[in-house]
From Swiss-Prot:
Source organism of this protein record: Streptococcus pneumoniae (strain Hungary19A-6)
Protein name (Swiss-Prot/TrEMBL): Arginine deiminase
Superkingdom as given in the UniProt entry: Bacteria
Database matches in InterPro entries: Arg_deiminase
Similarity-based family: Belongs to the arginine deiminase family.
Reaction catalyzed: L-arginine + H2O = L-citrulline + NH4(+)
PANTHER family registered for this protein in UniProt: ARGININE DEIMINASE
HAMAP family: Arg_deiminase
Main location per the UniProt record: cytoplasm
């Protein structure tokens, strides 16, 4: 076995180890009035979402893949009382609690939870004001009075089951991301503790991006096309400045990649990440949403004389990919088969967001029937999972998974 606990040098190598997060009580803290604040469009039914997620995890195990869980890894990282206390204080500091008495009450509540995983899951779920002792009227400050109708002392983290985004494994390294929205940036705290203190991963993995950066990048915009070539998305959630910082670190730390293809496409919620419109499913096959093709700009980025060299690519995308992957021809498989209605509907339901677990073997939502049929016509083996509730969060199988180990291809 390699001495590196993280080994991810492709999108398609046989998946051996993956991290998920089983949806928890955080989904039951979603309210209609605050969906936009928490980056949701709808409210999943937790019981069914958990059943769907458990079936997803079991489908991976049935393929011989070891499934890890974020909540367990984070709990295992609290290896001493001092680290546990530090975690609670950082969590409180990042929760934007404006009232001192509320902060004291939450600290007491969290310290009263003795089991580490229960503690971690509570921080994920959020804290309602009704869980805390009532503040006497005479002790309330202006913040308490003005925000009296808001039900949460600390917001939930309902997007956590999309484990692809808070950090990304790249080769033997990790990009610990600074995320687009404050409501999600708190999620990266768990990755910080895993890669700093976990018995297996702590202190053993190079960071090529740090959550303390002030520019934004998310894992859905970080794809590994081969051991030499990365793809990154300039999207609603990831800006060009972050990509430049990431790439300089990757090249300087000699992580192993020689070139990056940067994809610039429409900046909107429909296409929030590159992997919602473009994924690799085999050595020479990709899914793509046809709506991005007209406005797509691709830049080749290399590192020469200690600086980035950036060239805009003007040619055909399939030819560009074939050239960079060293294959004769690349097939772009269009979501919805090019039918404008099917493409829009199935992209919204993550028809382009596939998780490849081996060359030509992909996990997909069963609901995207048009796209799935086309994938099968291209000779791919599909592992179809239900996602009626999971999809309400606007993410598919790739969004819900973070590979920790793949075989080389």
């Amino acid at each position: 076995m390699s001495s590196h606990p993280i080994q991810v040098f492709s999108e398609i190598g046989k998946l051996k180890k993956v991290m998920l997060h089983r949806p928890g009580k955080e989904l039951e803290n979603l309210l209609p009035d605050y969906l936009e604040r928490l980056l949701f469009d709808d409210i999943p039914f937790l019981e069914d979402a958990q059943k769907e997620h458990d079936a997803f995890a079991q489908a991976l195990r049935d393929e011989g893949i070891e499934v890890l869980y974020l909540e367990q890894l984070a709990a295992e990282s609290l290896t001493s009382p001092e680290i546990r206390d530090q975690f609670i204080e950082e969590y409180l500091d990042e929760a934007n609690i404006r009232d001192r008495q509320t902060k004291v009450a939450i600290r007491e509540l969290l310290h009263g939870i003795k089991d580490n995983q229960e503690l971690v899951e509570k921080t994920m779920a959020g804290i309602q004001k009704v869980e805390l002792p009532e503040i006497p009227d005479e002790a309330k400050d202006l913040t308490d009075l003005v925000e009296s109708d808001y039900p949460f002392a600390i917001d939930p983290m309902p997007n956590l089951y999309f484990t692809r985004d808070p950090f990304a494994t790249i080769g033997n390294a990790v990009s610990l991301n600074h995320m687009f929205a404050d409501t999600r940036n708190r999620e990266t705290l768990y990755g910080k503790y895993i890669f700093k203190y976990h018995p297996i991963y702590g202190g053993k993995v190079d960071l090529v991006y740090n959550r303390e950066e002030d520019t934004r990048i998310e894992g859905g915009d970080e794809l590994i096309l081969s051991k030499d070539v990365l793809a990154v998305g300039i999207s609603q959630r990831t800006d060009a400045a972050s990509i430049e910082k990431l790439l300089v670190n990757i090249f300087k730390k000699n992580v192993g990649f020689k070139k990056v293809l940067a994809f610039e496409f429409a900046n909107n919620r429909k296409f929030m990440h590159l992997d919602t419109v473009f994924t690799m499913v085999d050595y020479d096959k990709f899914t793509i949403h046809p709506e991005i093709e007209g406005d797509l700009h691709v830049y080749s980025v290399t590192y020469e004389n200690e600086k980035l060299k950036i060239v805009e690519e003007k040619g055909d995308l399939a030819e560009l990919l074939a050239q960079n992957l060293g294959v004769e021809k690349v097939h772009l498989i269009r979501c919805g088969g090019g039918n404008i209605v099917a493409a829009a509907r199935e992209q919204w339901n993550d028809g382009s967001n596939t998780l490849t677990i081996a060359p030509g073997v992909v996990v997909v939502y069963d609901r995207n029937t048009v796209t799935n049929k086309i994938l099968e016509e291209y000779g791919l083996r599909l592992i179809k999972i239900r996602g009626s509730e999971l999809v309400r969060g606007r993410g598919g199988p790739r969004c819900m998974s973070m590979p920790f180990e793949r075989e080389e291809v």
